[in-house]
Amino acid sequence: MSSPPPDLPTAPRARALACLREVAFLNERARQSSRRIEAYRNAVTVVEGLSEEEFARHTEADSWQELRGIGSSTAAVVREAVAGEVPTKLAAAREEHGGPLLEMTPAGRELLGLLAGDLHSHTSDSDGGAPLLEMARAADALGRDYLAVTDHSPRLRVANGLSAERLVAQRDTVAQVRQQLADEGRSLELLHGIEVDVLDDGTLDQREDLLATLDVRVASVHSKLRMPSAEMTPRMLAAVRNPLTSVLGHCTGRLVTGGRGTRPPSEFDAEAVFAACAQECVAVELNARPERQDPPDELIALALEAGCLFSIDSDAHAPGQLDLLAFGAQRAADAGIPPERIVTTWPATQVKEWAAARL
């Protein structure tokens, strides 16, 4: 079942911000055009940055489009919101995208309710569509107990991967956002992590001393996905056996649908890789993005038989995509994965202890 629309604030600025955020969230959740959605996220930043006097002046003059970053669509949302109305764009987004993401079985719904957190998400520091604070607020609103921010590592330049210096700077941002969340009375625990590239030789694409300071590390292959199995298998085994690896991300790299087209799964000795995951207590990610559905069903069964832990993650690149966990929960329920073997059902304290146990 879908949740009822949230009550909108009555204060004009708070109402405008809530409406802009909800339009963005619902379109992100439905994986609509990112460029169009970014306009609403940018408008949030603009409206939030206005002084009280500036906000009052633009409200009275209806001069929202004079502001850089406010276009006709976002101006209409703000105008209707400050007038106390439900904006037309918001009503349409609720109608079109506010329903259930998928039809879930009772077992799937039960497992979704057991998920405490999410260990794979991205912000605008790399290739995400929103700043960390917006991601954290959305995760809190969805009832998550914790969220790990795991922006990309430097090798992945196309995704604006973080250099060592930028990763250190992000640590300060995480601390600031943690304080902001506390000041807002939110209970979400924010974890600082990384999605670190597995390089061709199986090493991890970041300084080991920095990786060791993080709460969690998702190791993923993003390059040379068509590498022969004889080369891909030792590459993945080296990453899994590295004590810094917590989660093996989207292990086949496949794409089954979506705007980026399709991509076949990488070839590797799955029995050997999953045996190593089980031995090293590295979780196999069950990536919830519908275009990935990674691992495939037959590999989930193989990892389950091998005794692996799992991590159901959204791989969200925008706040609304944090809701994609439902797809992962249903796949895990269909596969019969016991909840206790899914690390994202564990409390944050247990997750951090597990991720640090091999350091």
Model regions: which residues?
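Long, highly charged, low-complexity intrinsically disordered interaction regions
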Residues: 2-108
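Charged catalytic cores and adjacent phosphate/nucleic-acid-binding surfaces used
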Residues: 2-12, 76, 87-115, 132-137, ...
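Single, functionally critical "micro-switch" positions that shape active/binding sites
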Residues: 70, 119, 150, 249, ...
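Ser/Thr-glycine-rich phosphate-binding loops at phosphate-binding pockets of nucleotides
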Residues: 119-124, 146-152
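Core AdoMet radical
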Residues: 148-149, 194-196
